[in-house]
Each structure stands twice: as structure tokens, then as C-alpha cells.
Amino acid sequence: MVRLALVVAEFNYDITSLMLQKAIEHARFLGAEVTYVVKVPGVYDIPMVLKDVVAKSDVDAVATLGAVIQGATKHDELVAQQAARKILDIAVEVDKPITLGIIGHGANRMQALERVEEYARRAVEAAVKLARRKKLLKDAKYSGATVYVE
């Protein structure tokens, strides 16, 4: 069973609380166990806790959830791009799956609400699949025939 942590931004919590509910439901559907739900103030703050979360021995993968709503300036673009870049950097550094379930940039509130389920499910599904496949790859042995890890 994959042990999954969810890191959720509280900013735009009317949206991210729904994402959290959908993520937990989908994790259960996939047979994963949600071991931690960690709330942070905003999407930009997600990278601040990731190393602590992935260091937990009872976490195989992390799905990040958040919503960056378009405003009058380019602030949403900056927040979403920098958070995504740092999340990927940390995932590669720690060698554990950390997936991106962040709506935005450029999304308005209505678009974000329409994308709640899709983004939450995709982030959880990718995290669970990656964790399972990393384990399969680690345990795989080549014996003269191509090894497929799927």
C-alpha cells in the first residue's frame, strides 16, 4: 500500500478544501493510505515543508494541492511558476515522488472551481503510480528479456 502525504495551500481555501476532499477520496479509491495532511498558508509556501514531509518514514509520495487565482498583475504567474519549479527540484533531490496539483496560473475563480476534481485526482493518481513504479523498478531484475515497469 502506498503511503501518501497531502500538502494543501490554505489560500483560496474555498477551492483547496474541495481539492483536499477529492484527493482523499481518490487515494482511498486507489488503495493508498493518506498518512499526513499538511496545511500551509499558500502555494508559495508548499516547498518550505516538503523536505520535512518526505523525510517521514511513513511517506512514499506527496501530492501538492493549491489554487493560484489570476489577479490584476502577474503575481499569480510568479507564484505558480516558482512553486512548481521548487517542488520539482525537491522531488528530484530527495528521490521521492512529489506531484503537482496546483490550479493556475491564469485561472479565474470559476475556472478553478471547475478544475477542482481533475487536478486533485491527477495529482494523487500520479503520486500513487510513481511510488508503485519506483518500488517495482527498484525490485526489478533483468534476466535477458526486456523488463517493463508499469
From Swiss-Prot:
Cited SUPFAM superfamilies: Lumazine synthase
Entry keyword annotation includes Transmembrane: no
Domain of life from the UniProt record: Archaea
Protein keywords: Riboflavin biosynthesis, Transferase
Pfam families per the UniProt record, alphabetical: DMRL_synthase
Binding site residues for (2S)-2-hydroxy-3-oxobutyl phosphate: A72, T73, R115
Reaction(s) catalysed (UniProt annotation): (2S)-2-hydroxy-3-oxobutyl phosphate + 5-amino-6-(D-ribitylamino)uracil = 6,7-dimethyl-8-(1-D-ribityl)lumazine + phosphate + 2 H2O + H(+)
GO molecular function terms listed in the Swiss-Prot or TrEMBL record: 6,7-dimethyl-8-ribityllumazine synthase activity
A single GO cellular-component term on record: riboflavin synthase complex
Residues bound to 5-amino-6-(D-ribitylamino)uracil: F11, V43, Y44, D45, A67, V68, I69, L100
Pathway terms, separated by semicolons: Cofactor biosynthesis; riboflavin biosynthesis; riboflavin from 2-hydroxy-3-oxobutyl phosphate and 5-amino-6-(D-ribitylamino)uracil: step 1/2
Signal peptide: none
InterPro entries: LS, LS/RS, LS/RS_sf
EC number of this enzyme: 2.5.1.78
GO BP annotations listed: riboflavin biosynthetic process
Keyword Cell wall biogenesis/degradation (UniProt): no
Enzyme class: transferase
Entry annotation: catalytic residues: H75
Family in the record: Belongs to the DMRL synthase family.
Protein task: Catalyzes the formation of 6,7-dimethyl-8-ribityllumazine by condensation of 5-amino-6-(D-ribitylamino)uracil with 3,4-dihydroxy-2-butanone 4-phosphate. This is the penultimate step in the biosynthesis of riboflavin.
Protein known as: 6,7-dimethyl-8-ribityllumazine synthase
Organism: Pyrobaculum neutrophilum (strain DSM 2338 / JCM 9278 / NBRC 100436 / V24Sta) (Thermoproteus neutrophilus)
